[in-house]
Amino acid sequence: MVQGGSSISIRKKNFCIIAHIDHGKSTLADRFIQKAKIISDRDFKSQMLDSMDIERERGITIKSQAVTITYKSNDGDFYELNFVDTPGHVDFSYEVSRAISSCEGALLLIDASQGIQAQTVSNFYMAFEHDLEIIPVINKIDLPNANVDFVKKQIKNDLGLNEEIAISISAKNGIGIDDLLEAICKYVPSPRGSIKDPLRALIFDSHYDSYRGVVVHFRIFEGQIKMGDKIRLMHTNSEHLIEEIGIFKISLERKDTLEAGDVGYFIAGIKNISDVKIGDTVTLCDFPALSPLEGFKEVKPVVFSSVYPVDANQYDDLLKAMDRLKLNDASLTFEKDSSSALGHGFKCGFLGLLHLEVIQERIEREFNLNVILTSPSVRYKIIPKKGESYFIETPEQFPGNEAIESVLEPYIKANIIVPTEFLGNIMSVCLLKRGVQTNLIYLDTKRVELIYKMPLSEILFDFYDKIKSVSRGYASFDYELLDYEYTDLVRLDILVNGDRVDALSQLVFKDSARTKAIGICKKLKDEIARQQFRIAIQGAIGSNVIARETISPVRKDVTAKCYGGDITRKRKLLEKQKEGKKRMKMVGNVEIPQSAFLAVLKSNDN
């Protein structure tokens, strides 16, 4: 937040709504929109700011969405409220951090029936570190098991906030919304900065319009911008002419001028997607700022998977889709990749498994492309016997065991908050996932916080679902990355008739390699069609075969035309068939159907 200068307007307030997943952020945003009457009742629908079908179907927010409303307070003043509805899932915490960077205040939403959860704490610290004014909001007070007094104690004891200013609401029923709006006007600081200073505005998001090019979302900290201005993006040093500026009111609303404190958008005929970088600073060409604003901390992907088009002819379409998604999702990384089995595609980096699933669904829905994703993995560190250490993300990059001194894998610090009655269940799950308990804190008589150190690879697939299952849905989970630690990792290769299938190779923990290999071999046996020769499916670590399945050959009745007669005639035909099968086995390539690859990938998810 820019300090110094005078308040631009006492009637402008910028804030975001942050909370643990499913605590009611989008529902509260809906009530604000209805209160401001910026959309007719006929056009209104729930989750108004969740524009993607996948968000509505899953009931989650994936993209932060900004909107501007006007509110008349009890003192008669009109306030322009710019607010951002943010995601709650840990995979999209980068979206939350960008929203926080463009605000002066935050509404910390807490479910009255569940209390403070892991992501509540994580988002609180993020807002606290950015020096935001935090207003605690207790939601869902209409629920039969709501306990407002207990949650107020948590706000005081766990977060150190003043529980007296906490606002109790029911976003679903519209209870307490007026009190909350009054608190926003009272407690959230007005933005600071002078409109006389050179323009400095922070790009916090963007999306692509097929007709007008890139639509840039930005927050102005100093100066002003108007139609026809020539701007410079300070990071890429590219210059553009402003064609349209405006604010977000569900749809885009044009304005002639925007000034310090405003959150809005601009369109400048930018067709080259690479010209726009999230975190870049916008300034004017004829009155430039001397230095850019502090951008966003570059986020690093933690989960890696390769994406391939089912139809190889759609590679160029997939490239365009990835470029468009990257514009709208700065946390997505990708580079070109190829596989002998799956063709040309892209090696992608994601923030988590939900992020991966969302990107896959967006590719298929928004761009009408069918794609295959390889088994997700993390980034491992290789220390060779000779030379410097390096990182790998795919099994193909894994060198032979004879060349490796040691392997390191990324570890996380897992924070799990759970009712005390489910403590034993959670500890059992963490133990199975190679977790090491580092702390156990009783938050009160009913809740305990468990802190574990565990490998990132162990939480990729089913960890979140398992802790939810064994706690009847009450456990909450958040994590942060730690450093790398030594591990006993091996590359599991799958061989079909002695030939390694690159697309099926996996990096696995040595103790679980045999179980994994047996499962894959059985899956392939069910999926690969029988041939006229025997097919051997093997799981191997280096030259050691640890699992095997055999597909028996189809037997063609070559003696069918022999009606009676000499038995030696039949024997000759059978011997000839036997020799033919030997030759066929030597030169025959086994065709592995796409369904087999999908079956193996699906088994990894389970």
UniProtKB/Swiss-Prot annotation:
Looking at the record, the residues that make up the tr-type G domain are 10-192
Q: Cellular component per GO?
A: plasma membrane
Q: Name one Pfam family in it.
A: GTP_EFTU_D2
SMART domains hit by this protein: EFG_C
Q: Which Gene3D superfamilies match?
A: 3.30.70.240, Elongation factor 4, C-terminal domain, Elongation Factor G (Translational Gtpase), domain 3, P-loop containing nucleotide triphosphate hydrolases, Translation factors
Topology relative to the lipid bilayer, per the entry, is:
Peripheral membrane protein
Query: Which InterPro entries does the UniProt record give?
Result: EF-4 (IPR006297), EFG_II (IPR041095), EFG_III/V (IPR035647), EFG_V-like (IPR000640), EFTu-like_2 (IPR004161), G_TR_CS (IPR031157), LepA_C_sf (IPR038363), LepA_CTD (IPR013842)
Q: Which GO terms describe its molecular function?
A: GTP binding; GTPase activity; ribosome binding; translation elongation factor activity
| One GO BP annotation of this record | positive regulation of translation
Q: Which reaction does it catalyse?
A: GTP + H2O = GDP + phosphate + H(+)
Top-tier EC class: hydrolase
Where do the coiled-coil regions begin and end?
none
Principal cellular location given in the protein's record: membrane
Q: Which PANTHER family match?
A: TRANSLATION FACTOR GUF1 HOMOLOG, CHLOROPLASTIC, TRANSLATION FACTOR GUF1-RELATED
Main function? Required for accurate and efficient protein synthesis under certain stress conditions. May act as a fidelity factor of the translation reaction, by catalyzing a one-codon backward translocation of tRNAs on improperly translocated ribosomes. Back-translocation proceeds from a post-translocation (POST) complex to a pre-translocation (PRE) complex, thus giving elongation factor G a second chance to translocate the tRNAs correctly. Binds to ribosomes in a GTP-dependent manner.
Which protein family is it in? Belongs to the TRAFAC class translation factor GTPase superfamily. Classic translation factor GTPase family. LepA subfamily.
Protein's recorded name: Elongation factor 4
According to its UniProt entry, this protein's organism is: Borreliella burgdorferi (strain ATCC 35210 / DSM 4680 / CIP 102532 / B31)
The root-end lineage is:
Bacteria, Pseudomonadati, Spirochaetota, Spirochaetia, Spirochaetales
Q: Which gene encodes it?
A: lepA
